[in-house]
């Protein structure tokens, strides 16, 4: 059957409306693509505060960063894999390695192995606090040790350290830092592990000199082969007279962008962070002063979408001056 003129006009108008609708949907899709999700940590933690600082910086540049709290490192990796609205996460540099060794879920394991680096953030030191007389990691054999909440970065790092050192505590107890310190001061456990940038507020404010507690040096050769050696400087805590050798991990901002659907937005995100670092140092959490975005991280490859966009900010970076963002010593 041949269409009459009115029918042809209606069909043409219908096609035009459909084209406009498709265009509008395309625009809406572009707007949605400017949304990014970032999984961090508990709402009182440094990771979450870093996320909020980034959100404030990015809002003025047209990127809506949605910052999510979490229960810890394992939760972060699972969220990156399983939750489509989350493309970015903050984890410790050894956490993904630990997860690939321990994670039974093959999909999560495969994704963890392939997560690329966006930027390094700052170092976090291993703090092992124990009752007097426990002078090295080996002395924790047969002892009761608190290792953080299950699934947290502290938890996974503690498991890795004891495995590397060949030390088997009588029990590794999962509890948060405040609970662990209360148990340690009461003599119900022998030691606690905390992995965080010094000074850790809890250890600075709640431990007293007459508690009879001290840091345990972390010097086992097998641990030093796998982790970066560092120290907690003398006087970092009021009850700590001498420097203590230990090891550190690095807090990392990582991505999970299956299908590379957010390549351009993550790249633009990276460019804004590079150019906005002086603002973050001035207006954000004090630990932004410790951040060096160009620092290489052993075993990690930066996302090529980040390299592509952030490299266009090199001149801006040099104009700002590296001294302004040199990590504290």
State where each predicted segment sits.
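Pocket-lining segment of extracytoplasmic ligand-binding domains
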Residues: 93, 104, 167-262
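Bacterial N-terminal signal peptides
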Residues: 17-26
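An extracytoplasmic/periplasmic, membrane-proximal ligand-sensing/linker region
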Residues: 175, 179-186, 196-209, 215, ...
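A structural signal for short loop-to-beta-strand junctions that line the ligand-binding cleft
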Residues: 107-121, 236-244
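Pocket-flanking alpha-helical
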Residues: 68-109, 179-183, 199-207
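Bilobed "Venus flytrap"/periplasmic-binding protein-like clamshell domains
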Residues: 35-58, 124-186
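Ligand-binding clefts/hinges and TM-proximal coupling segments of bilobed small-molecule sensing domains
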Residues: 150-160, 228-298
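Bacterial N-terminal signal peptides that target proteins for export
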Residues: 2-18
